[in-house]
Amino acid sequence: MTRNWKVSKYQTVTSIKYFISFILFVLITNHVSSRILLRPCAEYLWNMRQTDIFINSSQEERAFLELQRFEDKTRFEILIGEAPQLNTQSFNKKIQEKAIELAKYSNEESIDSIANVFADLLSLCIFVLALLLGKKEIAVIKNLVNTLIYSLTDATKSFFIILFTDIFVGFHSSHGWEILIEVFLKHLGLPENKDFIFLFVATFPVVLDTVFKYWIFLYLNKISPSAVATFHNMNE
């Protein structure tokens, strides 16, 4: 009995270490490959083969809006006396310097986006390979998670279920999904199309909610009917 417990403990600790090391390795690989290996290649391809500064229309709109905001702010500060009076030539030169600054920033952002695409693909390949090679460790972690879930009380299970549903498919979750999609599209250098974002926000949480309810009906209702009953009572 003691020997089996020690073996189980050893397997669990080893699997958790494997999981943590695996996550850290993927994150470090993504960062190193993006910054050191892939970015110089992306910079060469973008600067030598492309004449554009902006990688998509959304990035261009952000730069134009920032330049317009800077110009309006400069005019306002001059009018209220917080900045010295400038002649037309000096004013245009100041705006030009800001435009050059924005152009350089946008160009660097475009290069980063290209490097991010290839770095993410590389990380995905490593992730899949690690899953295939570490089936034993993953199975142990899965058993550990199942044991932890089964050890929870019905009220605790219901609390986490309600928390999960409210965060991901609740009434206010749409704003969070919008931010996540915009950050993801910007990370990959894709245009932040509002129609696509609104369509995703309108459909994906609904699909996720349907899948979750189906899981409760098909799986949780079999292994823990009392937890489902507690969930419905707490939800009401």
From Swiss-Prot:
Topology term for the membrane: Multi-pass membrane protein
Example of a GO MF term: antiporter activity
Subcellular localization: Plastid, Chloroplast inner membrane
Reaction catalysis annotation: K(+)(in) + H(+)(out) = K(+)(out) + H(+)(in)
Keyword Thylakoid part of the UniProt annotation: no
One of the protein's GO biological processes: potassium ion transport
GO cellular component, one term: chloroplast inner membrane
HAMAP family found in the cross-reference section: CemA_PxcA
Role noted for this protein: Contributes to K(+)/H(+) antiport activity by supporting proton efflux to control proton extrusion and homeostasis in chloroplasts in a light-dependent manner to modulate photosynthesis. Prevents excessive induction of non-photochemical quenching (NPQ) under continuous-light conditions. Indirectly promotes efficient inorganic carbon uptake into chloroplasts.
Name of the molecule in the record: Potassium/proton antiporter CemA
The organism of origin for this protein: Chlorokybus atmophyticus
